[in-house]
C-alpha cells in the first residue's frame, strides 16, 4: 500500500500548488489486477484497487476545485525486461513470449512498454480534453472475471 497508494497520494498533494497553477494533469499507473487479481497477487491487487478509488475521487474533486485532471491507466500483461527474466527464472525458454496460447494473449503477443508509454502521453496531454476521474484498462480481452494466473506460464 505504501508504494502503490500512499506514495501517489502524497506526490499529488505535494505537487497540487504547481498542478493548480499550470492546470496540470495526473496519470496514475494502476493494473488490471485492481479488478480481478491473479491468485498469488492479493496484496498487490488490493493496493491497485485502492489507487483506482483514489483516482476516481481525486479526479472529481481536484477537477472541480483546482482544474486538475486525474486519470489512471490499468495496463495488463506487459513485456518488460523484468517479465522476460522472471519467466526464464521459472524455466521457460528465452523467447517464451513469441508463441503464446490465445488463452493468455488472444492477439498472440502481450503489450509492449512503448504502447503503454504512447497511451500515457495521450492521457497527460491537453488532447485528451476535460476527461477526469477515469480508469482506462489497457488489455486485449474483457477484464472483469478473467485474469488467469500466468505464473508459472503453461506453454505446453
Where do the model's predicted regions map?
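Residue(s) in the substrate-gating loop at a strand-loop-helix junction
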Residues: 31
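Short, small/polar-rich loop/turn modules that mediate ligand/substrate recognition or access, typified
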Residues: 64-69, 131-133
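Short C-terminal tail/terminal secondary-structure segment
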Residues: 36, 121, 132-156
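Active-site loop immediately N-terminal to the catalytic Tyr-X3-Lys motif
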Residues: 36-42, 65, 108
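Alpha-helical segment proximal to the catalytic Tyr-Lys
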Residues: 17, 60-64, 129
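Active-site loop-to-helix junction immediately N-terminal to the catalytic Tyr of the SDR YXXXK motif
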Residues: 37-45, 57, 86
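Active-site helix of classical SDR
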Residues: 12, 47, 55
Amino acid at each position: 500500500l505504501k508504494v502503490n497508494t500512499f506514495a501517489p497520494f502524497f506526490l499529488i498533494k505535494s505537487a497540487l500548488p504547481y498542478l493548480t497553477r499550470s492546470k496540470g494533469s495526473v496519470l496514475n499507473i494502476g493494473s488490471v489486477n485492481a479488478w480481478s487479481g491473479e491468485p498469488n497477487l492479493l496484496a498487490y491487487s488490493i493496493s491497485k484497487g485502492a489507487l483506482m478509488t483514489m483516482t476516481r475521487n481525486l479526479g472529481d474533486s481536484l477537477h472541480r476545485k483546482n482544474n486538475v485532471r486525474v486519470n489512471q491507466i490499468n495496463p495488463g500483461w506487459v513485456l518488460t525486461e523484468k517479465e522476460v527474466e522472471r519467466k526464464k527464472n521459472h524455466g521457460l525458454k528465452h523467447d517464451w513470449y513469441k508463441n503464446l496460447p490465445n488463452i493468455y494473449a488472444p492477439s498472440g503477443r502481450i503489450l509492449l512498454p512503448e504502447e503503454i508509454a504512447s497511451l500515457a502521453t495521450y492521457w497527460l496531454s491537453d488532447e485528451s480534453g476535460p476527461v477526469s476521474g477515469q480508469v482506462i484498462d489497457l488489455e486485449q480481452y474483457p477484464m472483469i472475471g478473467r485474469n488467469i494466473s500466468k505464473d508459472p506460464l503453461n506453454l505446453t
